[in-house]
């Protein structure tokens, strides 16, 4: 005679299977079968094999990203990180996620709460979290590597498209001669503020 279990005596790790329900059907094809043979992929498998039958190296499928772009012009540097020893402690600070909104403590007034919201990220840019000496060192490394990209572009009033003197003409022309500035690049792939400027800058005066 079988033992009858109710909900009170049945262990929680048992589950009920309805005999009237649909029967279980095993997965097809079985993942433990030789799927290469099942689907007739032997030829493709031999073409993309990493090693030959005798153990020698065959086709190299994977290439590093640097090898894929080596035919492009320009210089490509390793991003400074803590692991490669080029960025020190700066990378985890720059790329870390912030916690979001500040926590409103009990008894905090409206003005205190507003200041907490305004300055909630201030600690990220102060010691010991941010090492500004390390930031200056990393920037100087890029300046030495890409002097053409980090040269002092300078700011000139004629860069603004405003009628500053009320004459109806902007500052693009000084002394009756149009001043053209060229932004030269050394072929670097780095994005700099003036790297996308055309050689002949055309400015429009705002009406």
Swiss-Prot record:
Q: Which GO terms describe its molecular function?
A: transcription coactivator activity; transcription coregulator activity
Query: What is the first-listed, main subcellular location in coarse terms?
Result: nucleus
Keywords attached to this Swiss-Prot or TrEMBL record, sorted alphabetically, are: Activator, Nucleus, Transcription, Transcription regulation
Q: What does the sequence similarity comment in the record state about its family?
A: Belongs to the Mediator complex subunit 19 family.
Output the superkingdom of the source species: Eukaryota
What function does this protein fulfil?
Component of the Mediator complex, a coactivator involved in the regulated transcription of nearly all RNA polymerase II-dependent genes. Mediator functions as a bridge to convey information from gene-specific regulatory proteins to the basal RNA polymerase II transcription machinery. Mediator is recruited to promoters by direct interactions with regulatory proteins and serves as a scaffold for the assembly of a functional preinitiation complex with RNA polymerase II and the general transcription factors.
In the record, which residues are listed under signal peptide?
none
This one is known as Mediator of RNA polymerase II transcription subunit 19
Query: Where, per UniProt, does this protein localize?
Result: Nucleus
Q: What is the lineage of its organism?
A: Eukaryota, Fungi, Dikarya, Ascomycota, Saccharomycotina
Q: Which organism is it from?
A: Eremothecium gossypii (strain ATCC 10895 / CBS 109.51 / FGSC 9923 / NRRL Y-1056) (Yeast)
The UniProt entry, under Pfam families, shows: Rox3
- UniProt GO BP: negative regulation of transcription by RNA polymerase II; positive regulation of transcription elongation by RNA polymerase II; positive regulation of transcription initiation by RNA polymerase II; regulation of transcription by RNA polymerase II; RNA polymerase II preinitiation complex assembly; transcription open complex formation at RNA polymerase II promoter
């Amino acid at each position: 005679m079988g033992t009858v279990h109710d909900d009170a005596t049945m262990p929680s790790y048992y589950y009920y299977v309805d005999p009237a329900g649909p029967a279980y059907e095993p997965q097809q094809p079985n993942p433990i079968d030789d799927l290469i043979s099942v689907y007739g992929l032997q030829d493709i498998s031999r073409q993309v094999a990493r090693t030959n039958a005798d153990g020698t190296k065959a086709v190299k499928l994977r290439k590093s990203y640097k090898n894929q772009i080596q035919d492009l012009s320009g210089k490509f540097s390793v991003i400074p990180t803590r692991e490669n020893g080029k960025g020190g402690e700066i990378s985890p600070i720059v790329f870390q996620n912030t916690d979001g909104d500040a926590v409103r403590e009990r008894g905090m007034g409206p003005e205190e709460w507003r200041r907490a919201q305004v300055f909630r990220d201030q600690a990220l840019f102060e010691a010991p979290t941010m090492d500004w000496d390390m930031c200056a060192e990393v920037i100087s490394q890029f300046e030495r590597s890409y002097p053409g990209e980090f040269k002092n572009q300078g700011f000139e009033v004629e860069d603004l498209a405003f009628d500053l003197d009320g004459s109806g003409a902007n500052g693009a022309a000084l002394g009756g001669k149009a001043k053209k500035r060229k932004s030269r690049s050394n072929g670097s792939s780095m994005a700099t503020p003036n790297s996308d400027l055309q050689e002949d800058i055309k400015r429009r005066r705002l009406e």
